[in-house]
Amino acid sequence: QEYTGWMDF
């Protein structure tokens, strides 16, 4: 999972 700065669903 890449970090988007928000919750990864």
Curated annotation (Swiss-Prot):
InterPro entries assigned to the protein according to its UniProt record, in alphabetical order: Gastrin/cholecystokinin_CS (IPR013152)
Positions where Sulfotyrosine occurs in the chain: 3
Keyword Secreted: yes
Tissues where this protein is expressed: Expressed by the skin dorsal glands.
Cellular localisation: Secreted
GO cellular component, one term: extracellular region
Residue(s) carrying Pyrrolidone carboxylic acid: 1
First-listed, main subcellular location of the protein, grouped into a coarse class: secreted
Modified residues (Phenylalanine amide): 9
One example of a Gene Ontology biological process annotation: regulation of blood pressure
Keyword list, A-Z: Amidation, Amphibian defense peptide, Hypotensive agent, Pyrrolidone carboxylic acid, Secreted, Sulfation
Family assignment from sequence similarity: Belongs to the gastrin/cholecystokinin family.
Record's function text: Hypotensive neuropeptide.
Protein name: Phyllocaerulein
Lineage: Eukaryota, Metazoa, Chordata, Craniata, Vertebrata
